[in-house]
Curated annotation (Swiss-Prot):
It catalyses: tRNA(Ser) + L-serine + ATP = L-seryl-tRNA(Ser) + AMP + diphosphate + H(+); tRNA(Sec) + L-serine + ATP = L-seryl-tRNA(Sec) + AMP + diphosphate + H(+). SUPFAM superfamilies: Class II aaRS and biotin synthetases (SSF55681), tRNA-binding arm (SSF46589). Pathway: Aminoacyl-tRNA biosynthesis; selenocysteinyl-tRNA(Sec) biosynthesis; L-seryl-tRNA(Sec) from L-serine and tRNA(Sec): step 1/1. Keywords: Aminoacyl-tRNA synthetase, ATP-binding, Cytoplasm, Ligase, Nucleotide-binding, Protein biosynthesis. Homodimer. The tRNA molecule binds across the dimer. It comes from Buchnera aphidicola subsp. Acyrthosiphon pisum (strain APS). L-serine binds at T233, G234, E235, E287, S387. This is Serine--tRNA ligase.
Amino acid sequence: MLNPYLLRNELHLTAKKLLKKGYKLNISKISSMEEKRKTLQIQTENLQFKHNALSNLFKENKNIKNKNELLRHQVIQSSKDLNASKIELNSLKEKIHHFSMCIPNIPSDDVPEGNTSINNKEIKYWGQKKKYDFEIQDHIELGKKFNELDWKSSAQMSGSRFVIMKGKIALLHRALSQFMLDLHTLKHGYIESYVPYLVHSEALYGTGQLPKFSDDLFHINLTDKKKYILIPTGEVPLTNLVYDQIIDEKDLPIMLTAHTPCFRSEASSYGRDTKGLIRLHQFDKVELVQIVKPEKSYEALEKLTNHAEKVLQLLNLPYRKMLLCTGDTGFAAVKTYDLEVWFPSEKKYREVSSCSNMSDFQARRIKARYRKKSEQKNFFVHTLNGSGLAIGRTLAAILENYQHSNGRIEIPKVLQKKYMQGLEFIN
């Protein structure tokens, strides 16, 4: 959530910046609630002062019968007035909190303005697109040809947007996750974690998926009191590992990674990419999360994005790096880079990683702070996250980019010996 100071003292400037993200802040509503909060805050403080004074006076005059009886009634009434004011104030604070939870983060000043992906800025291209002297097939056709991507069986048991992988393609899927985890832990310094795939709603409020994106989540309601949500990304449990913590300054940065399945209903993308591995209800991803000091977060974003890029470079997959415009930047992010890998069958780039700086937006929600030794004060950390990478989409890109005219799929050299049991081709 945003720093409350911005909504109390820089309201119109904040509203102007939020408009760049396509969010129209209800200035009159927040102003009205804040004015009422100030009035109730002063009223409650005055009633507390009055109640304390009457209570002390009552104690001082407890031996004077007539006066004590009058004071007793005044103390009782002041207590009722104070409690009523506190209830009203807390109720209003809850409304302000709920209102604030629906406000997105403010985009960074260096993010290009725009409403759609057409306004995203190309930062760089990497790798050479292969030229084919034969008619190429997409990953769906290739999977069917090898009988190792089975949509028919998955549809029978689970419906659309699921897939069953078999044989060498299943092995390649596993190999990719192990390769990514080894790279990020052994070369980039991340700590691997195994995390829950079912979380309470509070965890998703903390990272910003709730309340806005509830329809895109899978909810499991066992009883009225026992409710879970399947994680849409490893970002959720990894970021919540620092929930309500005060971290020693010397322990920053914290760099975490995990391989998890991700579950998304894709309600907001109905009708898009209904076939193939691009947009599934269940897919795997290696997630990267960093917890850093505020002054280091933009530098950390560049490093985190480079870590994700290294996966694509070692797999020798052509890609481009895009800086998202304000309207395309996510709800909780101030700045986001997308890494898009080349799909030759479509002659287009597809997102395979999204790397974002969330500033203190998530930290305020989950109360994640660090203690600054020089000042002996607590400050909110900054959080970052990114895919390193989405495994299914990476696999699909390999199938398409590494196909040969004889129908075989070459295995990227970095995977062959260590991760693919010495296999060089999928036949």
